């Protein structure tokens, strides 16, 4: 849905917006001015070679061939000059292309760094509403289109500009009157370029959006492959993909037909008109006196090169439109305001005792109803507060606010008496250990997945942390132990093993606040028994907020909060809640009888 809305917005991009995108793209060249100047000099040399080549042929035709004045020395000089121009042009062309490629690659490299950096500053709301495939498309495909613009469009524009100026200078030098007549074709050329630019832009915008939708569908299918196969969704997804792919094909065919209609025939028409003008002019001249054949050749050759330059510009307009469209999509991310919740960064706001207070906190996701309503509780330093409730009751939302993934609308969260908004985000994350139900693992090895590239963490600390959470036992059975390779998302490990590694990752940072999001939900009973002792030791001296699926794991919690529809409906210790024989008591009894917690509610 987001991609389609974006397409509608871009189809009405104004001229001012178009210029702003171009200006912003060109701003990336400011660090490459010396290289661009040098490349411009090389382009000028190539242009001069193209301009002087017809003059050498003209001299040969008019001064030597027509009057039959075949002086060998002069012919050798002309031949050597023409050959030298051709070889020199080829050498200079190589370096010109090399420099343009280098500049383009460096610009796109910086642009990708900028957009990747920006993505990591955005809040979770942005990722909730934007398909992952669309984001990947912008970082890869769209920046690649920008690279093509600098390599092909910018180089062609500079070269064509020099070529047009050089050609007209040579034409005026040869025959002022005919050069003036040729200017009559300019309005037609400008009109064709205007029409081509106006209509081709729509096709290229649509193509970029369809490509983004293709990437989004592919990413969705791959990330959910197990569900797709389990529920026999392959045929449905293939049909959806075929539809998007067909739309992409249809847009591409419309663009090809438009190019075939306007590029080739239009340029051929202008060339035919130019030849008619030249032949008519020299035909009239021949009635008065002799006509220089070399001059006729030079003019036709110049018009051929002139129209070739125009054709190249029009052909590159397609790339230009694609690059403008792609760049506007990239800049939309860079201009995105849905950033990580802002922090006041009060220097006096330090986490020392780790006392946590929720005061009448209410929160809603994008455009929805409140998922948390007036939540209030206090976790004293070193205490464990457990959150229980059915799916959608608001447990994970409390964790998300605690980690500052989202901004809450009303109320406040205090840590050691200071608003959570006052703490530096880096300190807050550093002193808070988070263990999720679905633990994520990166490419690399077990060592780096526990250390997370923190050079201050030693190998000894990694081993101690793994032993602390009972992960060392299974790691020692692996062939490379702590250097054992981890593939994407740790797919070669069981859920329990991934969870144990995530425990070690948290313990090794020695956090003051511990947040457990159903951390033992994916652990089998035997493994859970192994880590319960470790978790109990880990909670000692740390303020802990834990979402519990198995109520048996939170009997020793200092405070248990029972949530339903975003509200706290019961609170107390395990014993007091059991004695009250309310919702928690029913949940506990039903779960002990083997029923699921959600079924209990």
Locations of the language-model features?
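Membrane-integrated ABC transporters
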Residues: 1-50, 65-78, 95-100, 104, ...
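An intracellular "coupling" helix at the cytosolic face of ABC transporter transmembrane type-1 domains
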Residues: 124-125, 141-150, 154, 158, ...
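Transmembrane helix-loop-helix hairpins at lipid-water interfaces of multipass membrane proteins
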Residues: 36-92, 172-177, 289-293
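Juxtamembrane helix-loop junctions of ABC transporter transmembrane domains
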Residues: 10-18, 41-42, 49-62, 85-132, ...
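Hydrophobic alpha-helical transmembrane segments of ABC transporter permease domains
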Residues: 41, 53, 59, 92, ...
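Helix-loop-helix
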Residues: 71, 170-184, 258-328, 334
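ABC-type nucleotide-binding domain
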Residues: 276, 342-343, 349-601
């Amino acid at each position: 849905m987001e991609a389609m809305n974006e397409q509608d917005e871009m189809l009405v991009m104004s001229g001012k917006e178009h210029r702003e995108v171009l200006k912003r793209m060109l701003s990336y060249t400011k660090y490459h001015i010396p290289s661009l100047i040098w490349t411009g000099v090389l382009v000028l040399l190539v242009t001069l070679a193209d301009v002087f080549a017809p003059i050498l042929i003209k001299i040969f035709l008019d001064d030597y061939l027509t009057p039959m004045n075949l002086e060998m020395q002069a012919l050798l000089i002309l031949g050597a000059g023409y050959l030298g121009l051709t070889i020199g042009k080829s050498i200079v062309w190589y370096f010109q292309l090399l420099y343009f490629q280098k500049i383009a690659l460096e610009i796109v490299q910086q642009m990708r760094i900028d957009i990747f950096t920006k993505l990591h500053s955005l809040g979770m709301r942005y990722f909730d509403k934007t398909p992952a495939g669309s984001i990947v498309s912008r970082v890869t495909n769209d920046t690649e289109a920008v690279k093509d613009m600098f390599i092909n469009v910018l180089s062609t524009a500079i070269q064509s500009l020099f070529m047009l100026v050089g050609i007209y200078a040579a034409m005026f030098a040869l025959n002022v009157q005919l050069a003036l007549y040729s200017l009559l074709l300019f309005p037609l050329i400008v009109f064709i370029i205007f029409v081509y630019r106006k209509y081709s832009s729509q096709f290229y915008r649509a193509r970029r959006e369809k490509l983004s939708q293709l990437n989004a569908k592919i990413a969705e299918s791959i990330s959910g492959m197990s569900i797709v196969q389990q529920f026999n969704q392959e045929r449905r997804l293939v049909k959806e993909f075929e539809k998007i792919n067909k739309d992409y094909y249809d847009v591409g065919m419309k663009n090809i037909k438009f190019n075939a209609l306007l590029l080739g025939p239009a340029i051929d028409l202008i060339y035919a008109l130019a030849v008619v003008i030249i032949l008519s002019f020299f035909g009239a001249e021949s009635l008065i006196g002799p006509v220089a054949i070399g001059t006729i050749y030079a003019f036709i050759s110049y018009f051929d090169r002139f129209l070739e330059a125009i054709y190249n510009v029009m052909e590159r307009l397609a790339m230009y439109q694609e690059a403008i469209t792609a760049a506007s999509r990239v800049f939309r991310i860079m201009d995105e305001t849905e950033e990580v919740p802002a922090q006041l960064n009060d220097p006096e706001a330090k986490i020392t005792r780790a006392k946590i207070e929720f005061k009448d906190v209410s929160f809603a996701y994008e455009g929805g109803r409140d998922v948390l309503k007036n939540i209030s509780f206090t976790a004293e330093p070193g205490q464990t507060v457990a959150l229980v409730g059915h799916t959608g009751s608001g447990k994970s939302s409390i964790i998300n606010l605690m980690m500052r993934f989202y901004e809450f609308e009303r109320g406040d969260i205090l840590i050691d008496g200071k608003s959570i908004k006052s703490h530096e985000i880096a300190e807050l994350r550093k002193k808070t250990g988070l263990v999720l139900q679905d633990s994520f693992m990166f490419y690399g090895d077990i060592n780096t997945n526990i250390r997370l590239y923190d050079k201050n963490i030693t190998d000894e600390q990694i081993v101690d942390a793994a032993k602390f959470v009972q992960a060392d036992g299974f790691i020692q059975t692996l062939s490379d132990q702590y250097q054992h390779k981890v593939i994407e998302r740790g797919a070669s490990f069981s859920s329990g093993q991934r969870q144990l590694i995530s425990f070690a990752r948290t313990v090794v940072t020695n956090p003051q606040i511990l947040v457990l999001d159903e951390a033992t939900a994916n652990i089998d009973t035997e493994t859970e028994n192994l880590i319960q002792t470790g978790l109990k030791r880990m909670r000692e001296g740390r303020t802990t907020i834990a979402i519990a699926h198995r109520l048996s794991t939170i009997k020793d919690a200092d405070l248990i909060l029972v949530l339903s529809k975003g509200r706290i409906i019961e609170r107390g210790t395990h014993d007091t809640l059991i004695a009250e024989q309310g919702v928690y008591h029913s949940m506990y009894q039903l779960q002990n009888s083997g029923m699921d917690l959600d079924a209990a509610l």
